[in-house]
A protein has these predicted regions:
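Catalytic phosphate/metal-binding cores of nucleic-acid and nucleotide-processing enzymes, i.e., regions
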Residues: 2-84
Length: 84
């Protein structure tokens, strides 16, 4: 199991924390696996803020062009998260 440090814009971090968003659409270039940890760090004006979350990947959707998911991208699902 690995930890993937990723940038996230504030509006999308807000949606996770306040509006129940439980997925991320990402380039599938890091070898994501169910059970891995996402470390989503908020970025603003080109730098990191002190806000973010960690979450365990519980589902991965890949290679579904019939539903509009382009090759090379994936949707990462997670249930629970911890605010940093």
């Amino acid at each position: 199991m690995r930890t993937h440090e990723l940038k996230i814009r504030g509006i999308y971090l807000f949606d996770i924390i306040c509006n129940g968003k439980r997925f991320e659409l990402r380039k599938d270039d890091r070898g994501f696996e169910v059970g891995d940890t996402l470390w989503l760090r908020e970025v603003m004006d080109g730098g990191y803020t002190n806000r973010g979350i960690t979450a365990e990947i519980t589902y991965i959707l890949r290679d579904c062009p019939e539903y509009g998911l382009q090759k090379g991208y994936c949707i990462l699902g997670f249930d629970r998260y911890d605010i940093l």
